[in-house]
Amino acid sequence: MTIRVGIAGATGYTGVELVRLLAQHPEAEVVVAGTESYQGQHLAAVYPHLRERVDLVGREASPEALAGCDVVFTSLPHGLTMALAPAVLAAGGRLIDLGADFRLRDVTAYEQWYRKTHTAPDLMEEAVYGLPELYRERIRGARLVGNPGCYPTACALAAAPLLQAGVVETEGIIFDAKSGVSGAGRGVNLGVHFSEVNENFKAYNIAGTHRHTPEIEQTLSDLAGRPVVVSFTPHLVPMTRGILATGYFTLKAERTTEQLVDLFREFYAGEPFVRVRPAGELPTTKQVWGSNYCDIGLQVDPRTRRVLVISVIDNLVKGAAGQAIQNMNLLFGLPETTGLLNAGPVYP
């Protein structure tokens, strides 16, 4: 049976990436392409790269329009999905939210960081965090999945083997992350104009003010079995796609790079979308461009007894649309690679 898919927010960068990837999915069909800005227009007219690949017309993503969908992806600004979710679930559909409304478990934390009252706190408690490498079995039985943010995906996958094995201290963890400009979305924003970002490089939302901070800490606390606080500094770099996150961890005892590479390989054995590099080799963003892969490399600094872990993803794929489809595959009992293995990487 073909999975009937609805997308609310189909014409933003993340939404159109969902459309692109689902067009090659053998078990799914997009039947509702919801958009506020392009209702009545063919998506291929808005995004010409989709010509001859999709035949979809933008429409309102109303509860009535989405009622016949088996699964709905929401790629909306925070605050909007919480209003739509009850109707989608009541109609028997499943929902995967690529926004922020169902990522955090703590309502108070959500309201503090996003400065909005959460109108569906009961669903917030029900939602499953959609990072398959860590929460796969819970995702399989979910009605509602909070798809992780792009930075939290890269950071969590860099940290998971170390924290679960208990080989690093839980204090003093630092993440220094760089993102391409598409992470800021498609809307008009002076900060991402060509003349502002070209040949430029800047940090933003530093010192614990970025909204992905509590999401990173939530996952790392799960892994460590105790509260974890991190220092997270994001940067904007003049490229279209990609995230490179560097994690700094203090080792509890002396370990070699080779030993920790073995630890990572054992932890991610059988994971179709995590590729651990051999000792002495570090990944680059270009090597995952357009794909659902997370590539990881690491090196021990014996002088400081730290291990540095480099994690790279495509922010629009493993950091958003690809991971959402990976979650959809789990929800419907499909191999989680379905429709994703032909999606890159594109190089150079």
Curated annotation (Swiss-Prot):
<dbReference type="InterPro" id="IPR000706">
    <property type="entry name" value="AGPR_type-1"/>
</dbReference>
<keyword id="KW-0963">Cytoplasm</keyword>
<dbReference type="InterPro" id="IPR000534">
    <property type="entry name" value="Semialdehyde_DH_NAD-bd"/>
</dbReference>
<dbReference type="GO" id="GO:0003942">
    <property type="term" value="F:N-acetyl-gamma-glutamyl-phosphate reductase activity"/>
</dbReference>
<keyword id="KW-0560">Oxidoreductase</keyword>
<dbReference type="InterPro" id="IPR036291">
    <property type="entry name" value="NAD(P)-bd_dom_sf"/>
</dbReference>
<dbReference type="InterPro" id="IPR023013">
    <property type="entry name" value="AGPR_AS"/>
</dbReference>
<feature type="active site">
    <location>
        <position position="150"/>
    </location>
</feature>
<dbReference type="GO" id="GO:0005737">
    <property type="term" value="C:cytoplasm"/>
</dbReference>
<keyword id="KW-0028">Amino-acid biosynthesis</keyword>
<comment type="pathway">
    <text>Amino-acid biosynthesis; L-arginine biosynthesis; N(2)-acetyl-L-ornithine from L-glutamate: step 3/4.</text>
</comment>
<dbReference type="GO" id="GO:0006526">
    <property type="term" value="P:L-arginine biosynthetic process"/>
</dbReference>
<comment type="function">
    <text>Catalyzes the NADPH-dependent reduction of N-acetyl-5-glutamyl phosphate to yield N-acetyl-L-glutamate 5-semialdehyde.</text>
</comment>
<dbReference type="Pfam" id="PF01118">
    <property type="entry name" value="Semialdhyde_dh"/>
</dbReference>
<keyword id="KW-0055">Arginine biosynthesis</keyword>
<dbReference type="Pfam" id="PF22698">
    <property type="entry name" value="Semialdhyde_dhC_1"/>
</dbReference>
<comment type="similarity">
    <text>Belongs to the NAGSA dehydrogenase family. Type 1 subfamily.</text>
</comment>
<dbReference type="GO" id="GO:0070401">
    <property type="term" value="F:NADP+ binding"/>
</dbReference>
<keyword id="KW-0521">NADP</keyword>
<protein>
    <recommendedName>
        <fullName>N-acetyl-gamma-glutamyl-phosphate reductase</fullName>
        <ecNumber>1.2.1.38</ecNumber>
    </recommendedName>
</protein>
<dbReference type="GO" id="GO:0051287">
    <property type="term" value="F:NAD binding"/>
</dbReference>
<dbReference type="InterPro" id="IPR050085">
    <property type="entry name" value="NAGSA_dehydrogenase"/>
</dbReference>
